[in-house]
C-alpha cells in the first residue's frame, strides 16, 4: 500500500480529488467506483471545482456506487442515489444512464445483485475504486465476517453501522436494516483503489489496517493483498498507528 499522510480532512479531500481528476483527464474512457457517507463529501466538492476550473467534461466517465439501502426509492432524500446526485452528479455533465447504483427497490434483490455484477463486468471492470473504512473495518457494507470471496449481495446492517448512519435519518428506527453492497471480491477486482481515512474515530481501524494481518474479522485487511492501493490518512486517523510505531 502507498500511504500518503496529510494534516487534516480538507487536505485529504484535496489530494483525493486531485488524484481522481488526473485519472479522469488522462483516460479517454474510465469507470469509477464511488462511495458515500461523510468521508468523501469534500472530495466530491473539490472534484467539481477542478472540473469547472479546467472545463473538464465527464461525458466519458461511467460510475458504479458501492452500495444502496434496501427499501428506499431513488428519490428518497436518504437514498445513496439522492446523495450522489446532490453531491456530484447534478454538478457535472455525466449522462444519468452512465451512473449506476444498486436498486434497493428491485422486486428480486438476488437478481438485482447478479445484474449489478454483470453491469460492472460489461463495463470492463472498475478502473479506480474510492473507499472509506468503518471503525470495525467494514468496506462498502461488508461487515466483519463477510467472506473475501463475496460478490454483490444483500446484507443485514450491523447495529454499529446503523447507529453511525443514524445522523442522516430522523431516528435510528428509520435507518434501513438491509442494503445491497458490492462484495469484497468485487471491490478487490478494481484495477486501483483509493482509500480515505480521516478522524480519531478511524484511528484504531487505520492501525489495524497497517498491522498487515489479513482476516475476514477485519474486512479492510484484504486491501493489503491488492497490488495498487493508495491510502490517504490525516493526522488524527494516523495517531494510534504513529504512537504504536514509536513504542
From Swiss-Prot:
Reaction it catalyzes: alpha-D-glucosamine 6-phosphate + H2O = beta-D-fructose 6-phosphate + NH4(+)
Coiled-coil regions listed in the entry: none
Involved pathway(s): Amino-sugar metabolism; N-acetylneuraminate degradation; D-fructose 6-phosphate from N-acetylneuraminate: step 5/5
GO biological process: carbohydrate metabolic process; glucosamine catabolic process; N-acetylglucosamine catabolic process; N-acetylneuraminate catabolic process
Function (record text): Catalyzes the reversible isomerization-deamination of glucosamine 6-phosphate (GlcN6P) to form fructose 6-phosphate (Fru6P) and ammonium ion.
Its EC number(s): 3.5.99.6
Protein's name according to its UniProt entry: Glucosamine-6-phosphate deaminase
Active site: 67 (proton acceptor), 136 (for ring-opening step), 138 (proton acceptor), 143 (for ring-opening step)
Family designation: Belongs to the glucosamine/galactosamine-6-phosphate isomerase family. NagB subfamily.
Keywords, ordered alphabetically: Carbohydrate metabolism, Hydrolase
Record-linked PANTHER family: GLUCOSAMINE-6-PHOSPHATE ISOMERASE
Organism listed in the record: Shouchella clausii (strain KSM-K16)
Domain of life according to the entry: Bacteria
Alphabetized Gene3D superfamilies for the sequence: 3.40.50.1360
Gene Ontology molecular functions: glucosamine-6-phosphate deaminase activity; identical protein binding
Any Gene Ontology CC annotation: cytoplasm
PROSITE patterns: GLC_GALNAC_ISOMERASE
Amino acid at each position: 500500500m502507498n500511504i500518503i499522510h496529510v494534516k487534516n480532512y480538507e487536505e485529504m479531500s484535496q489530494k483525493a480529488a486531485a488524484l481522481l481528476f488526473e485519472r479522469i483527464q488522462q483516460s479517454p474512457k474510465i469507470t469509477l467506483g464511488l462511495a458515500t457517507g461523510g468521508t468523501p463529501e469534500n472530495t466530491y466538492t473539490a472534484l467539481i471545482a477542478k472540473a469547472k476550473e479546467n472545463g473538464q467534461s465527464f461525458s466519458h466517465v461511467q460510475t458504479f456506487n458501492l452500495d444502496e439501502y434496501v427499501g428506499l426509492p431513488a428519490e428518497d432524500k436518504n437514498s445513496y442515489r439522492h446523495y450522489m446526485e446532490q453531491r456530484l452528479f447534478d454538478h457535472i455533465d455525466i449522462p444519468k444512464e452512465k451512473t449506476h447504483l444498486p436498486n434497493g427497490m428491485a422486486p428480486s434483490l438476488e437478481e438485482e445483485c447478479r445484474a449489478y455484477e454483470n453491469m460492472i463486468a460489461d463495463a470492463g471492470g472498475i478502473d479506480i475504486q474510492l473507499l472509506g473504512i468503518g471503525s470495525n473495518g467494514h468496506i462498502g457494507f461488508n461487515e466483519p465476517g463477510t467472506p473475501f470471496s463475496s460478490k454483490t449481495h444483500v446484507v443485514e446492517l450491523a447495529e454499529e453501522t446503523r447507529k453511525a448512519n443514524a445522523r442522516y435519518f430522523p431516528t435510528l428506527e428509520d435507518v434501513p436494516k438491509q442494503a445491497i453492497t458490492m462484495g469484497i471480491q468485487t471491490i478487490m477486482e478494481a484495477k486501483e483503489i483509493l482509500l480515505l481515512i480521516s478522524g480519531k474515530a478511524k484511528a484504531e481501524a487505520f492501525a489495524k489496517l497497517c498491522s498487515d494481518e489479513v482476516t475476514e474479522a477485519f474486512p479492510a485487511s484484504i486491501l493489503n493483498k491488492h497490488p495498487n492501493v493508495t491510502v490517504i490518512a490525516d493526522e488524527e486517523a494516523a495517531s494510534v498507528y504513529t504512537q504504536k510505531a514509536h513504542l
